[in-house]
């Protein structure tokens, strides 16, 4: 994966500060460090849904593993966006269906149930963060 233009600017700014410091130690003044979470394709396919829908999916995932994830797959077809903008809607839909099947099939050994609950919590967290972005409020999660 190639670094973005912003990453290159951040690295260049950090290198300039390090070069300007005669002691060789880098100073953090004037340098903006951006931290981004790297997500795999299954996790990046979790849709940004309205908060009530995300809470319903969390409850469904809590009581019937994979059901909330299955429902969330259909929100992608209804226009919910994901962190996979370069993938087609059908591909993201099938990624969510695959995540639901993994959760259902591995629920027997409790792994799927735990994964399903965490998946639902991620849906709620994404819904909350999306709400903050739409309102323009700085967020602290």
Swiss-Prot record:
Record-annotated membrane-spanning stretches: 51-71, 87-107
Cell compartments where the protein resides: Membrane
GO cellular component term, pick one: membrane
UniProt key word Transmembrane helix: yes
Chief place where the protein resides: membrane
Keyword Transmembrane helix: yes
Record's bilayer topology term: Multi-pass membrane protein
Modified residue annotations for Phosphoserine: 26
Alphabetical UniProt keywords: Membrane, Phosphoprotein, Transmembrane, Transmembrane helix
Domain of life: Eukaryota
Cysteines joined through disulfide linkages: none
Family: Belongs to the SPEC3 family. Stum subfamily.
Name by which UniProt lists this protein: Protein stum homolog
Native source organism of the sequence: Homo sapiens (Human)
Annotated gene: STUM
């Amino acid at each position: 994966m190639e670094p973005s233009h912003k990453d290159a600017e951040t690295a260049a700014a950090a290198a300039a500060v390090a070069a300007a410091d005669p002691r060789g130690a880098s100073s953090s003044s004037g340098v903006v460090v951006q931290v981004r979470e790297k997500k795999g394709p299954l996790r990046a396919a979790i849709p940004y849904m309205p908060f009530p829908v995300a809470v319903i999916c969390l409850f469904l995932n809590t009581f019937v593993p994979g059901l909330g994830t299955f429902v969330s797959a259909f929100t992608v077809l209804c226009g919910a966006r994901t962190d996979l903008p370069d993938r087609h809607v059908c591909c993201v839909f099938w990624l969510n269906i695959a995540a639901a099947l993994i959760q259902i099939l591995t629920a027997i050994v409790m792994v799927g149930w735990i994964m399903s609950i965490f998946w639902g919590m991620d849906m709620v967290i994404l819904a909350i963060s999306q709400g903050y972005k739409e309102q323009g409020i700085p967020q602290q999660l």
